Amino acid sequence: MTSDSSDTAKQIGSGQPSGSPADMRRRDGVAPEQEVDPASLETDEDDEARLPDLPDEPVDAVAEAPLAIGRAAIEHAVRHAPTSPGVYRMMNAARDVLYVGKAKNVRKRLSSYARPTGQVMRIARMIAATAAVEIVSTGTETEALLLEANLIKQLRPRFNVQLRDDKSFPYILITGDHWAPQLLKHRGAQSRPGRYFGPFASAGAVGRTITALQRAFLVRSCTDSFFESRTRPCLLYQIKRCAGPCTGEIDFPGYTALVREATDFLSGRSRAVKEDLARAMEQAAADLAFERAALYRDRLAALSAIQSQQGINPRTVEEADVFAIHQEGGYFCVEVFFFRTGQNWGNRAYFPRAEKSFTPEEVLGSFLAQFYDDKPPPRLILLSHRIEESELLAHALSIKAGCKVVVSTPQRGEKKELVAHALTNAREALGRKLADTATQSRLLQGLAALLGLPQPPQRVEVYDNSHIQGANAVGAMIVAGPEGFLKNQYRKFNIRSESLTPGDDYAMMREVLERRFKRLLTQKAADSRAAAEQDSAPQWPDLVIIDGGLGQLNAARGVVDALGLSRVSLMAVAKGPDRDAGRETLFLPDRPAIKLEPRDPVLYFIQRLRDEAHRFVIGSHRKLRRKDIREAGLQEVPGIGPARKRALLHHFGTLKEIERASLADLGKVPGISAESARRIFDFFHARPA
């Protein structure tokens, strides 16, 4: 989906080479994020992304002098532009990419921008900011379409429609490289042998489906190494979520039949699978094998649970993605439904960034090209609005998929009903987001009034750290703004300093803030809009909130003063006596402490910010701790020798199940006393600071 080596790049209006998108970002001074992993948590709440920032619509007309300069740069480009297909990039004087477009005839398209009249305000503003034009020639218009989508996603130009929060979709994989196939969730490249089923809209949907599939088909979910090490069935066999092929509880033909049934169900032959199970249940009952009949009954119930979770399932559509777009209040929402093998595998709402002057058809057309830039398309794509160049898009996607892809806007029948259902969801999702945004804006105004800020903060960063007696220490930053929590900009910081005293919360906070603000100070492109859209690092916060008391505030203030920062406002939030919510104390530099009424909406808002930071940092800490526990096994549990370790593993099967066990369950293990059970439970459930 990128241009090949035969493409020719021409630099118009500048002596610099065009370079790759990554090169262009490096040239603008944007370094890759080094600090942290932004994808530390997967939740269903991520399915609806935040509303994008809308570029301000100017009231006055664009000044004639900048327009004339921009047209001159474009006219210069026209004289050297090819009449063949290609992609062009409008760039400002700072080398930021303003717009990426494609054309069947590049010279003709650029000529339309050089006309002195007839431009809409959005185009006029873009022309006025243009200082140079870059052109990449392509062999065909289809190549130009694919390259345009790729560049928009990478460069995030200001005047393009931008697909936001486009994380990869999860799949279900039934492996094909082991005699006893495994059932698991999969993201990323589909390189492992086996059958892939998806995409699913969220990790939560996949997790629920896999759990139900285990109950219905008893296919294993353990790793191959764990499978090979078993001498007795694990807990999943005991609770009837695995057939136990690892220890011969089921033979090869029997397990193969279960895998085939699971594959058939995921492939759309669910009715036949359910009929076979119903017949087997009736036969077992007739043979007075009531325990076996009950097993078939439970498997049928698990299949029914899967289908009830899926909601609407089409009768005549086997494989399709359904897109519907709704516009309201200057914002757009695109709702996407995924149908595979006649089953609804979930939906997701997107809120693309686009100026108000774009039409829904324009936004949807650009959205689709970017959406399938890194995803395999289905054979049928159903749309709520007719888009320009739908045939060109279908041709490009057909080449990508290796089969014919149809892009259609249905007018009647079940396909029309599916689109209408998606449109209803788009309308409701955007309504919820607009309501949430209005509430958020009022709360930010109240926060600004409380703190004496000149205007409501557009970016609030909240910091917290977590550890257990200094071990697995981690700091975290969450971000909030007028659109709510910006989860794609959350960051975590593994505490690195070897000189830090274990458990020194103030030193941990200083390290986190120093790393964050020093990175901001070293960013050469802090004011680059493209960089700000790409990454959180170049964006300065208007307000920093610390989870802690006066000591944490002083630690943060020391960092800010040492770095000479005057633009960042600080506040610390200390929990009330007995850590009661509603009795918090707010600490500000050089001001008396503030205590708000328990029912004050602004206090509730501050609590939400603080609690979200706490949730995120605790999750990050637990991931580090679980990793250490997995690597160390039960060796680190005090008072647990080899005999008790074997007893625990024999009883529960896996370390994960031991970690999940209740105190009462641990006490049932032979050789484990009440005192040992308490010690084990406390080890796995120690509360981080």
Curated annotation (Swiss-Prot):
GO terms, molecular function: DNA binding; excinuclease ABC activity
Region (Disordered): 1-59
Assembly and binders: Interacts with UvrB in an incision complex.
UniProt subcellular location: Cytoplasm
Residues of the GIY-YIG domain: 83-161
Protein name as catalogued: UvrABC system protein C
Entry function: The UvrABC repair system catalyzes the recognition and processing of DNA lesions. UvrC both incises the 5' and 3' sides of the lesion. The N-terminal half is responsible for the 3' incision and the C-terminal half is responsible for the 5' incision.
Residues annotated as domain UVR: 271-306
One cellular component term from this protein's GO annotations in UniProt: excinuclease repair complex
Family annotation (NCBIfam families): PRK00558.1-5, uvrC
Pfam families hit by this protein: GIY-YIG, HHH_5, UVR, UvrC_RNaseH, UvrC_RNaseH_dom
Originating species: Nitrobacter winogradskyi (strain ATCC 25391 / DSM 10237 / CIP 104748 / NCIMB 11846 / Nb-255)
Top-level taxon: Bacteria
Protein family according to the UniProt entry: Belongs to the UvrC family.
InterPro entries associated with the record: GIY-YIG_endonuc, GIY-YIG_endonuc_sf, GIY-YIG_UvrC_Cho, Hlx-hairpin-Hlx_DNA-bd_motif, RuvA_2-like, UVR_dom, UVR_dom_sf, UvrABC_protein_C
PROSITE patterns in alphabetical order: GIY_YIG, UVR, UVRC
